[in-house]
A protein has these predicted regions:
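ATP-binding N-lobe of GHMP and related small-molecule kinases
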Residues: 1-124, 128, 132-148, 153-163, ...
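Mobile "lid/hinge" segments at catalytic clefts and subdomain interfaces of large enzymes
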Residues: 167-170, 174, 178-207
Length: 207
């Protein structure tokens, strides 16, 4: 996914940074995370990509190749706490406002080009992937200092309080904390977890 080329086409300049957040599958424990149960998810190679550059507009200027008809959406910093727009940008705005409330200091604007290869509605957590991507972008470029588990909780808060989805912690956790070739046994009640190898060899999992 060449997001740098797409960034240049949309914003007329070169991207300064690239980011990626995976999707996830869950091997055991469907619909148990929001009840405090155990889950066994792992991150996958498909996910959401971003190319990012700075602007001087004190705004987030956002474009998604997955929603080209929407075009570029501007979210001025002064509008972060306005109502959601029922667009994909609500996930970006939600993460930005939660992080701002937690102490993040956005010192300059960003142009952001996003392209994901996770099918919408396929159970691979495209929305959580976008949330963790945004959290990583803002945490990295504005020296937020937030720990990975804090970003996980920010994503859950966005889903529950801003988007309005009654979801648990598994999706964001699996994406933010995932490791290559390992699944994570997570107790969503205590948040204790351990990594276990997933060595498939010549075997495959059909979902």
């Amino acid at each position: 996914t060449d997001v740098t080329k797409g960034f240049t086409e949309q914003f007329g300049k070169q991207a300064e940074h690239t980011f990626f957040a995976p999707g996830r599958i869950n091997l055991i424990g469907e619909h148990t995370d929001y009840n405090g149960g155990h889950v066994f998810p792992c991150a996958i190679s498909l996910g959401t990509y971003a190319a990012v550059g700075t602007n001087e507009d004190n705004a987030f200027r956002l474009y998604s190749a997955n929603f080209p008809k929407v075009g570029i959406i501007d979210i001025p910093f002064s509008d972060l706490f306005q109502d959601k727009r029922s667009l994909w940008t609500d996930y970006f705005q939600g993460m930005a406002r939660v992080m701002k409330t937690a102490g993040a200091n956005f010192t300059h604007g960003l142009n952001v080009y996003i392209n994901g290869n996770l099918p919408d509605g396929a159970g691979l957590s495209s929305s959580a992937s976008l949330e963790m991507l945004v959290g990583t972008i803002l945490n990295s470029l504005f020296d937020g200092g937030f720990e990975p588990l804090e970003l996980v909780q920010f994503g859950v808060k966005v889903e529950n309080d801003y988007i309005g989805v009654n979801s648990g912690v598994m999706d964001q956790f699996a994406i933010e904390m995932g490791r290559a070739n390992q699944a994570t046994l997570l107790d969503t009640n205590t948040m204790k977890y351990e990594y276990l190898p997933v060595e498939m060899g010549d075997n495959v999992i059909v979902i």
